[in-house]
UniProtKB/Swiss-Prot annotation:
InterPro entries: DNA-dir_RNA_pol_bsu_ext_1_sf, DNA-dir_RNA_pol_bsu_external_1, DNA-dir_RNA_pol_su2, DNA-dir_RNAP_su2_dom, DNA-dir_RNAP_su2_hyb_sf, RNA_pol_bsu_bac, RNA_pol_bsu_CS, RNA_pol_bsu_protrusion
Record-given protein name: DNA-directed RNA polymerase subunit beta
Protein task: DNA-dependent RNA polymerase catalyzes the transcription of DNA into RNA using the four ribonucleoside triphosphates as substrates.
Subunit comment: The RNAP catalytic core consists of 2 alpha, 1 beta, 1 beta' and 1 omega subunit. When a sigma factor is associated with the core the holoenzyme is formed, which can initiate transcription.
Gene3D superfamilies: 2.40.50.100, 2.40.50.150, 3.90.1100.10, DNA-directed RNA polymerase, beta subunit, external 1 domain, DNA-directed RNA polymerase, subunit 2, domain 6, RNA polymerase alpha subunit dimerisation domain, RNA polymerase Rpb2, domain 2
An annotated Gene Ontology molecular function: DNA-directed RNA polymerase activity
GO biological process: DNA-templated transcription
Organism: Methylacidiphilum infernorum (isolate V4)
Keywords: DNA-directed RNA polymerase, Nucleotidyltransferase, Transcription, Transferase
EC numbers: 2.7.7.6
Catalytic reaction equation(s): RNA(n) + a ribonucleoside 5'-triphosphate = RNA(n+1) + diphosphate
Top-tier EC class: transferase
């Protein structure tokens, strides 16, 4: 038994919260989308249920027929996740939806199959066509409102706001240089803009009703929304200074003569105006004060429209220039753009953001734009222009949110159902004349929905093949946040600001882990403790602080909420009872760092590692590494290949075990119990106190398989080609507790993540072999397989039915000798266990050649021998170059089309069916024996006063009052589902036992049917496919020169030399070092963490313990010195070293210690390549490039210059002609080499001919001539007619 690794944790900070489940955000999101655990009638209007409620009911155009949605249910998946991975299937379950059709005839309810819905595995991934995929969470601009400012070329600041819906047109309102407010819909600039007052008037028409405060949409109603209207009494006299900023609300007419306008609307109140009004007897007027702002007054003056209908037409004219505007058309357009919930939806988040930002109380269920939103937003914009309030930072996490798996799939379902809706309406119209035969099944075509979902999972930018190199890469992929994808940013458009680290990322997005290259900053990773709230906004936890004392209350804050509080760091000194010790504390407040008195602290970080991601949290002494190197370190841990002998790090950070558990790389016991059986393929744990365990104590009878069975994954191929293999770490009879690790997986040791090995390192130069980050490795590391990994390559071949006849997988291949066929079986498929090299045949296949006119003798042969004499070519599957290994598995699947036609396939199918039947008959017999044993415990040698009757045959199995024997009990077990006994106490006991076994019998029957279905359905191969063969080749790769290695601190390098153990530098006690690194790799890179790790590693190794040094709370330097002295070393960690070759001592003492190194997925075996004979490009006739194409090396322009500099004319001629694209020259030099001559004759290179053709395409006539050994070239303009010899017009 392997003991659990015990680590001494040097973290001084008491964490207020343990790490959450690291993949829960994926599983919870999809569970919320499906709501499987909720009864159909109790489901919330969200996820899949919400999408159906949005689209349905669907009414016919005439309103006579209505199709309503009732509920949905999801069936059981046909195959288990493991079967889907093995057989290349999709892990999905059938979706059944109940619809109700209401027409003139009545109501019809029917359950309709809507296709297969991919199901999430417990690990948070999907299996699509046999490959594990992850749906990456998308970080996008949050729906809601955003206030911005920009600078005009005249130096003026122009303010604007943008209302972004979840679905629908964007609405932007912006100031222009004349302080007028213009509206832009869908970012349409230039002529398609209109004034804000025009939109408000139009909304008055669209929202006409008693509750609308816009009333009739007149000027006065609009003014009252933004200004306080005062009544000015003129008879009391006026103070000119007080009324200087007041203007009239509406025009004033002469009461005696209404045609005379005494004062116009918005005219300033002056002494002359007042006198004029008093003269006609007007005592008071309505005015507004425009001292604060006159924007709306200016807009009303400029507005060409005066009533709502005019406003509607004006908007229509702007958005649909050229179309004649009518009131109904204009109203319909505005409703479609902003007021139709099916076309315009702010979403839950958008409504929440609008209410929060504008401080309004609109009902959360109203998700269209309201007059209240527009008025409040315009008021806020006017305040901004006056210097009140602040603009929004679009890079702040408060302005961004996450679309989770559930939401992304729901959006696809919405698109699919929108297509279904159109089809349903069309079909309703077709049935219009006669609704008699109309049913929901006939109206609905499920293909629209299933095709959309399938397309999303297979092709979407956010559905990615899972990064499966090791468990950490898998976990990080599931915790990734992408700003790319549909509705997101594009690489080319994204500037520096959106990629940069932002203060609001603290505790939510890791500031370290992001890819290097074009995606830097666009793809981020969730921080360790972060989670999404119900609105998809990232939150991070804090501990509440009351009067300078830290409580255990945990509160989650979004980036917006956090800015209102004073928050202390996690490393603030705290006493045992939670009291903050320092009088003044370093805190964060409104994105700034400052010091305050401890009483002012309101919250505190829960852990120092809450700001970094899981991968960065695995780097010990992260606080001593430069950020760039930490980024490389966290990225390279994800590239570490699983080793065949993994070893957990001596110096860890304490979260290694959580990573292995949460990603389910290790198998964990679900119960307290005893290990009853251990094999390489499964572990069985019998729960403590279970009836089986008690029975075993009483007697030695009973099945060994009783208990919980844990199946182990054995030598499975990951997406990256690495090996997934689980091995037991418990023994039979061992007592385990719930949560104990039963089996290790890839890159784990005793339940902890183990990506590499601990090696004895020396930081010193060694004969120049570790120049420029190169790494010197001891031969011991290679011999003992410390860095050996297993790779599994998959090769596939398909035999199809072609026009010329069927392809055939066979051993009978033309023109192939016996030597090449020695490892093939009689069916033409390589045997498992065969050792293969490049060029070997894996699967023999022949394909019919195109038919040609046959000679009489061939026709005779064809007539005598049938199809076999037909002309066929060899199209066998061969091992590609660079691949060596052993065939570990072969999988063959046959198509249905030919099972009936080909005798061999039919007999194979029969044989398989027979085997399945026999296997399940045996299992059923074993289960009946168990039932007999269970019945024996209460009935053997007993008598019961009632008859036990077989209700099907009427036979009395056990007569009343007869002594019950084992034979009778077996008879009873045979007919367990057909027996009947009159009511009595013994009856309930018997039926209780039978009831326990019924589910097991049912499961067996289902499994049997499933396997038989698979045989009969031809294993679901595509149409036209006769046979499909997959061959898996395992390849054991040792560490070799050219392989890339790295530590956890971004200290990467390539193995430059593998040195014999006796030549390696050694310690005074004779121990040779394992690896030599260049000390110059440390100072300029500023990743001192590797040196501290080296010192602490050797001390811990000598003192016999493992270390956990959490990030930002690690071991202090003094403590490391103390350990080094305790371990009998110098406190500076340096040792005397001797040269292995000479035995002499090196001049300087050297840093020697234990460092954790990983082998990365960049191996020389994958990269090394040389071309001998290979394919050429069709156009240029030059060799192709790249290893995949078996290409050559490009001899480019600069290389030509180098040759010219040396005057190597003949080598250059050879390179640019016969070795490249001189087609005739290639043939001739081949002939001369075969003949043993050394003669080079060149002709015109093909690329020159291509150039001439291109010039001719530009109507330039090119002529090549030769005069007295000088080749001349003339280029002159011409016409298409001349070039084509008169063919072209």
């Amino acid at each position: 038994m392997n003991e659990k690794i015990q680590r001494i944790n040097f973290g001084k900070i008491r964490e207020g919260l343990s790490l959450p489940n690291l993949i829960e955000h994926q599983t919870k999101s999809y569970a919320d989308f499906l709501q499987l655990s909720v009864a159909p009638q109790e489901r919330k209007a969200e996820g899949l249920h919400g999408v159906f409620l949005e689209v349905f009911p669907i009414e016919s155009y005439d309103g006579k027929v209505k199709l309503e949605y009732v509920n949905y249910e999801i069936g059981e998946s046909k195959f288990s996740p493991i079967d889907c991975l093995r057989d290349g299937k999709t892990y999905a379950a059938p979706l059944y939806v109940t619809f109700r059709l209401k027409d003139e005839e009545g109501v019809k309810e029917e359950k309709v199959y809507m296709g297969e819905l991919p199901m999430m595995t417990p690990q948070g991934s999907f299996i699509i066509n046999g490959a594990e995929r992850v749906i990456v969470n998308q970080l996008h601009r949050s729906p809601g409102i955003c206030f911005e400012s920009s600078f005009h070329s005249n130096g003026k600041t122009l303010y604007s706001f943008r209302i972004i819906p979840d679905r629908g047109s964007w609405l932007e309102v912006a100031f222009d240089t004349n302080d007028l407010l213009y509206v832009y819909l869908d970012r349409r600039k230039k002529r398609r803009k209109f004034l804000i007052t025009t939109l408000l008037r139009a909304l008055a028409a669209a929202l006409s009703g008693p509750s609308s405060p816009l009333g009739s949409g007149g000027d006065e109603e609009i003014i009252r929304l933004f200004y306080t209207v005062e009544e000015l009494n003129l008879s009391e006299g006026i103070d000119e200074d007080k009324v200087a900023t007041k203007v009239l609300v509406s025009e004033v007419k002469d009461p005696h003569n209404p045609d005379v306008v005494l004062a116009r609307a918005y005219e300033p109140v002056t002494r002359s105006v007042v006198r004029q009004l008093l003269d006609v007897g007007i005592q008071s007027i309505s005015v507004v004060d425009v001292q604060y702002d006159d924007t709306l007054i200016k807009c009303l003056k400029k507005d060409p429209t005066k009533d709502p209908v005019e406003a509607l037409k004006e908007i229509y004219r702007r958005l649909r220039p050229g179309d004649p505007p009518t009131e109904s058309n204009a109203k319909l357009l505005l409703k479609r753009l902003l007021l139709d919930p099916k076309r315009y939806d702010l979403g839950r988040v958008g409504r929440y953001k609008l209410n929060q930002k504008l401080n309004i109380q609109v009902d959360p269920d109203i998700r269209i734009l309201t007059w209240e939103d527009l008025v409040a937003a315009t008021r806020y914009l006017i305040k901004l222009r006056k210097g009140e309030g602040i603009t929004d930072d679009i890079d702040h996490l408060g302005s961004r949110r996450v679309r989770t798996v559930g939401e992304l799939v729901a959006n696809q379902c919405r698109m699919g159902l929108a297509r279904t809706e159109r089809l349903v309406k069309e079909r309703m119209t077709l049935f219009d004349v006669n609704t008699e035969g109309m049913t929901p099944q006939k109206l609905i075509n499920p293909k629209a929905l299933s095709a959309t979902i399938r397309d999303f999972f297979a092709r979407s930018q956010l559905s990615q093949l899972m990064d499966q190199i090791n468990p950490l890469s898998e976990l990080t992929h599931k915790r990734r946040l992408s700003a790319l994808g549909p509705g997101g940013l594009s690489r080319e458009r994204a500037g520096f600001e959106v990629r940069d680290v932002h203060p609001s990322h603290y505790g939510r997005i890791c500031p370290i882990e992001t890819p290097e290259g074009p995606n830097i900053g666009l793809i981020a990773t969730m921080a360790s403790y972060s989670r999404f709230n119900d609105y998809g906004i990232l939150e991070t936890p804090y501990r509440k602080v009351l009067n300078g004392k830290v409580t255990n209350e945990i509160v989650y804050f979004t980036a917006d909420q956090e800015e209102n509080y004073v928050i202390a760091m996690a490393n603030t000194a705290v006493s045992e009872d939670g009291t903050i010790l320092d009088q003044r504390v370093a805190v964060r407040f409104r994105r700034e760092f400052m010091e305050v008195e401890r009483e002012k602290v309101e919250y505190m970080d829960v852990s120092p590692k809450q700001i970094v991601s899981v991968a960065a949290g695995l780097i010990p002494f992260l606080e001593h590494d430069d950020a760039n190197r930490a980024l490389m370190g966290s990225n390279m841990q994800r590239q570490a290949v699983p080793l065949i002998q993994p070893e957990a790090p001596i110096v860890g950070t304490g979260i290694e075990e959580r990573v292995a558990r949460d990603i389910q790389a290790v198998i964990v016991s679900e119960v307290d119990g005893t290990v009853s059986s251990v094999t390489g393929k499964e572990i069985i744990v019998t729960p403590t106190g279970s009836p089986v365990e008690q029975k075993k104590k009483k007697s030695k009878q009973g099945s060994e398989r009783e208990g919980i069975v844990y199946k182990l994954n054995k030598f499975m191929r990951s997406n990256a080609g690495t090996c997934i293999n689980q091995k037991p770490i418990v023994k039979k009879g061992q007592v385990v507790k719930k949560g104990d690790v039963l089996a290790d997986g890839p890159s784990t040791q005793n339940g902890e993540l183990a990506l590499g090995r601990n090696l004895l390192v020396a930081f010193m130069p060694w004969n120049g072999y570790n120049f420029e980050d190169a790494i010197i490795v001891s031969e011991r590391v290679v011999k003992e397989d410390l860095f050996t990994s297993i790779y599994i390559d998959e090769f596939e071949i398909v035999a199809r039915d072609t026009k010329l006849g069927p392809e055939e997988i066979t051993r009978d291949i033309p023109n192939v000798g016996d030597e090449a066929l020695k490892n093939l079986g009689p069916d033409g498929i390589i045997r498992v266990g065969a050792e293969v090299k490049p060029g070997d045949i894996l699967v023999g296949k022949i394909t019919p050649k195109s038919e040609t006119e046959l000679a009489p003798e061939e026709r005779l042969l064809r007539a005598i021998f049938g199809e076999k004499a037909a002309d066929v070519k060899d199209s066998s599957l061969r091992v590609p170059s660079g691949t060596y290994g052993i065939v570990m598995d072969v999988r063959v699947s046959s198509g249905t089309a030919r099972v009936r036609k080909e005798k061999i396939n039919a007999s194979e199918a029969k044989q398989k069916i027979k085997e399945i039947e026999e296997r399940y008959d045996q299992k059923e017999e074993e289960l009946r024996e168990e039932l007999t044993q269970a019945l024996s415990n209460i009935l053997l040698n007993e008598k019961i006063p009632l008859d036990v009757v077989n209700v099907e045959t009427g036979e009395i199995i056990i007569p009343a009052n007869r002594k019950i024997t084992k034979v009778l009990l077996r008879k009873m077990a045979q007919a367990y589902d057909k027996i009947e006994i009159d009511p009595s106490p013994i009856r309930s006991k018997i039926f209780e036992i039978i009831g326990n076994f019924e589910a097991k019998f049912e499961q067996l029957r289902n499994d049997r049917e499933l396997e038989l279905d698979q045989i009969e359905s031809g294993e679901d191969t595509e149409p036209g496919i006769i046979k499909q063969v997959k061959v898996f080749i395992a390849n054991k790769r040792k560490l070799s020169v050219g392989d890339k290695m790295a530590g956890r601190h971004g200290n990467k390098g390539v193995v430059s030399k593998i040195v014999p153990v006796e030549d390696m530098p050694y310690l005074p006690d004779g121990t040779p070092v394992d690896i030599v690194l260049n000390p110059l790799g440390v100072p300029s890179r500023m990743n001192v963490g590797q040196v501290l790790e080296t010192h602490l590693g050797i001390a811990a190794k000598k003192l016999g313990f493992n270390v956990a040094t959490p990030v930002f709370d690690g071991v202090k330097e003094e403590k490391i010195r103390e350990f080094l002295v305790k371990a009998g070393m110098d406190e500076d960690g340096k040792s005397i070293l001797y040269d292995g070759r000479t035995g002499e001592m090196f001049n300087q003492r050297v840093v020697v210690g234990m460092i954790y190194m990983m082998k990365l997925n960049h191996m020389v075996a994958d990269k090394i390549h040389a071309r001998a004979v290979g394919p050429y490009s069709l156009v240029t006739q030059q060799p192709l490039g790249g290893k995949a194409q078996y290409g050559g090396q490009r001899f480019g322009e600069m290389e030509v210059w180098a040759m010219e500099a040396y005057g190597a004319a003949y080598i250059l001629q050879e390179l640019l002609t016969v070795k490249s694209d001189d087609v005739q020259g290639r043939t001739r030099i081949y002939e001369s080499i075969v003949k043993g001559e050394n003669y080079l004759e060149t002709t015109t290179p093909e690329s020159f001919n291509v150039l001439i053709k291109e010039l001719q395409g530009l109507c330039l006539e090119v002529n090549i001539g030769q005069r007295s050994d000088v080749i001349g070239l003339s280029v002159k303009p011409t016409t298409p007619k001349a070039l084509s010899g008169g063919e072209a017009a």
